[in-house]
Amino acid sequence: MKLMHTSDWHIGKIVNQRHMTFDQEYILDNLVKMLEAERPDVLVVAGDIYDRGIPPVEAVELLDKVLSNILLQLGIPIIMIAGNHDSPDRLGFGSRLLRDKGLYISGPLLKDIQKVVLCDEYGPVNFYLIPYASPAVVREVFACNEVCDHDTAMKEMIRCIREKWNAEERNVVVTHGFIRGMEELEQSESEKPLSITLAVGGTDFVDVKHFDGFAYTALGHLHGPQQAGSPRVRYAGSLLKYSFSETKQEKSVTLAQIGKDGELSIECKSLLPLRNMRRIKGTLKGLLDPEVYANTNIEDYLHVTLTDEGELIEPMSKLRAVYPNILSLDIEIKERQVTESKTSAGQGYKHKSKLDLFSDFYTDMTGQMFTEEKALIVAKTISTLETDEREL
């Protein structure tokens, strides 16, 4: 069976006050074209369909358009679960009616975990849909007092699946969470923590060992495509970059082929966005030089770091005349190389000239050499001020 695994669409996302819906429509249209070319047996979307529980109207309309194209025009079934950004009840509304059209949505968590059976030439493939739910919800739904965190919650849900499954068949889990083995996972700033403990650096992870024996586990939540402790357990990642911590990530969808006896092959297929998200760095004059930006996409979403010394007048407006989609800007603060203490540097200040005092101050504050050119400018300014003072 050939499945296309994606996640974290975050339709309706706003990044630095910029609505991403147009970019999302572009990338989702390309996803539909890829589906048409690859013709997988099923599309799996592992949570965070929307960016917030109550999505804007344009986000709902975009999802309706995309799902209609996939289901009605291409005839490809869709399996979809709620993530931690979604409202389970809203996402799952009408799901039983939509099953006949090939759209399988798991919104609110149910004790009888939804099982979707799809068949290929080798027989059935069983998809177990586990939407995101907090440990408190899992504890209540499964009436299990042993559930105290995300790991014990997943352990209980997988235990219930194993009570009823046929281990000889090909079984797939679709879920949304923080699953890991021994290795570190690549994270990004746009991923909302699943709990307070994660937000303050806790270890509220789910052990990848819970998924032993499954042919494939399709994960959502982390935005970088990567495996999670096992080649059979993967994050597909988001389709777009949603923070500047993701600039080095290569966004893709995952094509997973599950053979007759559960043998697995993985291929990552890239989708090119309308606008990339990049960091650029340099002086204001340098970044405005046509030779610098001539061979780049000036429409990209940018974080700009300026390396100029001294005051700049309206740098953002000047930069946006060339780069219209700058989302953030900062000024590089060079590390100061202090070779002596301020106390020793200040010794003998009563016997120093104003120019020498300013030179010491400048070097101490910036860590830069006080050049002869700068000394001439400051000396002229001091002379002018002293002349004006005498005339008063």
Give each language-model segment a name.
Residues 37, 42, 257-392:
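Accessory, non-catalytic peripheral segments of nucleic-acid enzymes
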Residues 93-97, 101-199, 259:
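Conserved catalytic scaffold of divalent metal-dependent phosphoesterases
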Residues 113-121, 125, 130, 233-297:
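Binuclear metal-dependent phosphoesterase catalytic core
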Residues 185-264:
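Conserved beta-sheet core of the metallophosphoesterase superfamily
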Residues 1-68, 75, 373, 380, ...:
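N-terminal active-site segment of His-dependent metallophosphoesterases
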Residues 6-7, 43-48, 77-84, 104-109, ...:
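Active-site neighborhood of phospho(di)ester-bond hydrolases with catalytic His/Asp-centered motifs
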Residues 10, 40-58, 75-89, 178-202:
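Active-site neighborhood of divalent metal-dependent phosphoester/pyrophosphate hydrolases
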Residues 14-16, 49-67, 82-101, 107, ...:
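Metal-dependent catalytic neighborhoods of phosphoester/phosphodiester hydrolases
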